[in-house]
A protein has these predicted regions:
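Short beta-strand-to-turn element immediately C-terminal to the catalytic PLP-Schiff-base lysine
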Residues: 55, 185, 198
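Short glycine/serine-rich loop segments
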Residues: 153-195
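Basic nucleic-acid-binding alpha-helical/helix-turn surface characteristic of O6-alkylguanine DNA
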Residues: 1-152, 201-203
């Protein structure tokens, strides 16, 4: 049972005031973490590019997902790939939510969050690990990123790595475009990518 299913069950079992349900859920989440039965915590946050799902393990932030990816499908994928012990636990992601909030005001240019890279491997991981070298307000080409990752000929693979980045916004794949200026693929869609580039260009 994931966090959404648990919340539905709690609502049916305890049809009291929303505040009571929220406090009960918070206690259950804290107990699950204390007892080692919470492997993936998640929450959603509003943003100028739509609601974002944030998910974290003990190692750090493991997933950021746009609404267009279907948050329920993302949670199921996390349950399949990491652990079925997934729970809506907002406090575990307070720091990430705060940093994203400041980023979207234009006052934060980088993130200081521990990251869990387990959803990336090989050349894809190498590509993503270099993206923070692209400065805020700047862009780089897929060809340049392929060179940074150690394989100048792997431009298409670099583009695929950026397009499937499990940590968009935090790991700034939106700063990578084609050499001819085309925007390229993006998990959140082209409008979200343009919005992030415009935000950074204006700061």
């Amino acid at each position: 049972m994931n966090g959404n299913e648990l919340a539905s069950e709690l609502t049916r079992a305890f049809p009291g005031a929303p505040g009571d349900l929220h406090r009960l859920h918070a206690r259950l989440a804290a107990a699950a973490q204390r007892d080692g039965i919470l492997d993936v915590a998640y929450r959603t946050v509003d943003s100028p590019v739509g609601p974002l799902l944030l998910a974290a393990t003990e190692a750090g932030l493991v997933r950021v997902a746009y609404a267009s990816e279907d948050h329920d499908a993302v949670l199921q994928a996390l349950a399949d790939r990491i652990s079925p012990r997934v729970l809506d636990s907002p406090t575990r992601l307070d720091a990430a939510a705060r940093e994203l909030g400041v980023y979207f005001t234009g006052r934060r240019h980088s993130f200081d969050l521990p990251l869990d890279w387990r959803l990336s491997a090989g050349f894809r991981r190498a590509v993503l690990s270099h993206l923070t070298e692209i400065g805020y307000g700047h862009t780089a080409s897929y060809a340049a990123v392929a060179r940074l990752a150690g394989n100048p000929k792997a431009v298409r693979a670099a583009a695929t790595a950026c397009a499937t980045n499990p940590l968009p916004v935090i790991v700034p794949c939106h700063r990578v475009i084609y050499s001819d200026g085309r925007i390229g693929r993006y998990l959140g869609g082209p409008d979200a990518k343009r919005a992030l580039l415009a935000l950074e260009a204006a700061a």
